[in-house]
């Protein structure tokens, strides 16, 4: 009996040692955890287009080649939480939502920053748009005017995004009153909440209700009248525009590629991003620089 027990102990010890050696050589512990946003997310739509993960066939039909087993997160905050808690994770978020719980990678040697976004050196950049119909209520039109005013653009810049009009006129208070409903992108929501807070102090006769969902839902809400203003962190498509809305760009934002703070990788190429997200590269072993 003792002999059998000794043999079993030796086997378990060997298995444990083999697992440890495998991990140290880039085995299962080195496998990349790929984190993506959900379908309908403007951040996902812009990211897959700009990095080549989305491809078109000869007829112009688009295919999203994000790997099927990617972990899907339905908001920026959830992506941050997942990446900060997994040393092998990779994800992508709005540059303006970056915090010190994760590490933003350089892309092609360029760090995401206000300067590199404005210069065009950082390549993964997209607009923040709002979707509105003609004939907005006085209150909704006044809020839009505030967003595009010098006061609104300054709030956008202070929040870490790129203002689209450096010479915007000052906000002119009028007699607008009522309620404005704004819905859509979780990436746009944080800065929209700051804009709404400041606007309601400037015009105390208007209340602004900001509802977070995703870009596609926000655009649909604006089309069907569920909301006055839809938020989108991507370009609004021709098909969407044909349904009675117009697109107004309120800011520019980059998409930051993020990893865990303990990850040794600091820089990544566009080709490597595509390879990771389409599944042709599955470990970090040959990525460390």
Where are these regions (language model features)?
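C-terminal motif of bacterial Sec signal peptides marking the signal peptidase cleavage site
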Residues: 20-24
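Exported/periplasmic ABC-transporter solute-binding proteins
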Residues: 25-289
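Bacterial N-terminal signal peptides that target proteins for export
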Residues: 2-12
């Amino acid at each position: 009996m003792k002999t059998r027990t000794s043999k079993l102990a030796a086997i378990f010890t060997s298995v444990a040692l083999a697992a440890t050696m495998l991990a140290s050589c880039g085995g299962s512990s080195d496998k990349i955890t790929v984190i993506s946003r959900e379908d309908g997310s403007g951040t996902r739509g812009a990211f897959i287009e700009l990095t080549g993960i989305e491809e078109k066939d000869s007829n112009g039909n688009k295919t999203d080649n994000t790997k099927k087993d990617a972990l899907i997160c339905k908001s920026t905050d959830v992506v941050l939480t997942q990446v900060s808690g997994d040393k092998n994770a990779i994800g992508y978020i709005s540059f303006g939502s970056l915090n010190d719980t994760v590490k933003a990678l350089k892309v092609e040697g360029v760090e995401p920053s206000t300067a590199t976004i404005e210069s065009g050196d950082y390549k993964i950049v997209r607009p923040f748009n709002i979707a509105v119909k003609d004939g907005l209520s006085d209150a909704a039109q006044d809020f839009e005017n505030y967003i595009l005013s010098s006061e609104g653009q300054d709030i956008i810049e202070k929040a870490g995004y790129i203002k689209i009009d450096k010479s915007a006129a000052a906000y002119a208070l009028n007699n607008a009153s009522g309620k404005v409903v704004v819905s859509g992108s979780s990436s746009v929501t944080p800065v929209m909440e700051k804009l709404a807070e400041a606007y309601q102090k400037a015009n105390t006769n208007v209340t602004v209700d900001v509802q977070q969902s995703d870009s596609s839902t926000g655009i649909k809400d604006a089309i069907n009248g569920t909301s006055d203003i839809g938020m989108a962190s991507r370009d609004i498509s021709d098909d969407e525009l044909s349904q009675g809305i117009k697109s107004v760009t309120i800011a520019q934002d980059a998409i930051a590629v993020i990893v865990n703070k303990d990850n040794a990788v600091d820089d990544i190429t566009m080709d490597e991003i595509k390879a990771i997200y389409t599944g042709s590269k599955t470990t970090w072993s040959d990525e460390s620089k």
